[in-house]
Amino acid sequence: MSTFWSGYIALLTLGTIVALFWLIFATRKGESAGTTDQTMGHAFDGIEEYDNPLPRWWFLLFIGTLVFGILYLVLYPGLGNWKGVLPGYEGGWTQEKQWEREVAQADEKYGPIFAKYAAMSVEEVAQDPQAVKMGARLFANYCSICHGSDAKGSLGFPNLADQDWRWGGDAASIKTSILNGRIAAMPAWGQAIGEEGVKNVAAFVRKDLAGLPLPEGTDADLSAGKNVYAQTCAVCHGQGGEGMAALGAPKLNSAAGWIYGSSLGQLQQTIRHGRNGQMPAQQQYLGDDKVHLLAAYVYSLSQKPEQLANQ
């Protein structure tokens, strides 16, 4: 801000405060004998306005408000280029400096705790009850909005509490997913295989791979669907529908991991138009130490107690 505008703002602000002080004292009336008997000549419905001075507490409230304003402008920036003299902030208070100060205080308090767990493997951290509680709180703050408070997911968001993992369920894969995120793309096959191909493949996947019954009256050729699957789908999902973690291709021989639904219509929609899912990378926002705890918590959700004990 230029010197002119800084001075203009400071002069206008301070001038307003001085003017308010003058106005309050100039219009103040003191107590006088017989004051309560004098009226202003205003009356309505038997109610008259008396010529009494402002109550003392009210007058002092005005003064206190102006004094508070002056103190605030001394401590905080508010008069042009004036930075304020609030203790603890070199060069004046700003919201960025306050945030940095709070982060530094949090790091000083919790840094040793995070460092302790960062030196342990994810599998070891998953066996520590205190660490798991910390991870659960982090999960509730940062992950539950998509994956649910119970980590069982919802339509379009995977269940993190079962054994079905698109990108791998080992500790390293889970941590990588949280740190770097994942981008999953299921291409649309509607134009390539046609509407009949979509219906046939969907029926084949649901009945022959996942073992789910088809709705009564379903008109589909399972043999033709198997051929189309082998030509267009098996390269990612596997010949037997076992999936491929390297590509994030889900298992098709179990409906447990079908996050977009398992009905015949939902399968057809997925094959026809494809799907695009994204897990945002959290490293920049949470940092390595918090992600380490989160990974341990998520890892613990899909492990039985005896599995954790054998890590």
UniProtKB/Swiss-Prot annotation:
It is a multi-pass membrane protein. Belongs to the CcoP / FixP family. The keyword Cell membrane applies. It comes from Stutzerimonas stutzeri (Pseudomonas stutzeri). The chain crosses the membrane at residues 4-24, 56-76. Its cofactor is heme c. Keywords: Cell inner membrane, Cell membrane, Electron transport, Heme, Hydrogen ion transport, Ion transport, Iron, Membrane, Metal-binding, Oxidoreductase, Repeat, Respiratory chain, Transmembrane, Transmembrane helix, Transport. This is Cbb3-type cytochrome c oxidase subunit CcoP1. Pathway: Energy metabolism; oxidative phosphorylation. Residues 130-209, 220-302 form the Cytochrome c domain. Gene3D superfamilies: 6.10.280.130, Cytochrome c-like domain.
